[in-house]
Amino acid sequence: MLVCNSCPRGNRPLLTRGPTIPYELTKMLSLLLYPLNQALLLALIALLAMIFHWPRMAFWSLLLGVTWLYLCSTLFFADYLMGTLEDSYTPKAMSVTPDADAIVLLGGAIRGDTHMGSLGDLNQQADRLVHALALYKAGKAPRILVSGGGQPGARSEAEIMYDLLTLMGVPPHAIMQENASRDTYQNAVYTAVMLEKLGINKILLVTSAFHMRRAEALFKAQGLEVIPAPTDYQRLVGPKTMPGWLPAVSDLWQSTYALHEIIGYWVYRYQGKL
């Protein structure tokens, strides 16, 4: 088992040409881009406008906030946003999936340390773990690299995913750990360092379909040959059980995921990371 806790860059240059933003600030700013927080901010502006006797500003701020929150909470809008991310990555049968030198499994499927103890707790993106296991069992690559560092709790995502994969029958020698990354950009950078040392260039990249556009671009920017292996599709296909105009918490959550990815992609483009 190969483990990377700090992943020195070696001779590979950091591909950042634009301005960088500190990680903690990025996470804080991303919260302001969530539809619920935007609606609350507009409601606060409306309240302040009423206090200062600016009725026109109060009216339009409140109307904009309510309209935006409603729109993001509807199935038709959430599906539209997800479609812009997922439709380019249609699922492929295992029989037509190309072979590669390694499967790279990105973190995001672990909630962190919970009452379940050292194995952590899987979240709604657990399909990533299952899909990577299926690719390995199908003989598509001889090893799996799990990438994921900081998360709530004492252990990294990579450590927890390693334990889960070995529990499901993957031999320890076939799993590599990258424990240092804190975001998708670092996933790509640190993984590329590890794979370069092993002479590996062709990978099957496993992540959620809505996350694939950003992830694929970042890994390709590191010089890797990437075969997308998307999973965890969110956009509903076929007949809908509920009218698309009715708001629902699940649709608001889906819109939030999609907007996070769309904005994150363009922020990385602006920073020169893609």
Where are these regions (language model features)?
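Cysteine-centered motifs
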Residues: C4-C7
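Short, Lys/Arg-enriched N-terminal segments with co-localized hydrophobic residues
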Residues: R9-I21
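Hydrophobic alpha-helical segments of integral membrane proteins
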Residues: I21-L29, F77, L81-L85, L259-W266
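Membrane-embedded alpha-helical segments of integral membrane proteins
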Residues: I21-M50
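Membrane-interface helix-boundary motifs at transmembrane edges
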Residues: M50-A58
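A structural signal for short, hydrophobic/glycine-enriched beta-strand patches
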Residues: V66, L71-V249
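Extracytoplasmic/luminal low-complexity segments enriched in Pro/Gly and acidic/polar residues
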Residues: G238-M242, W253-L274
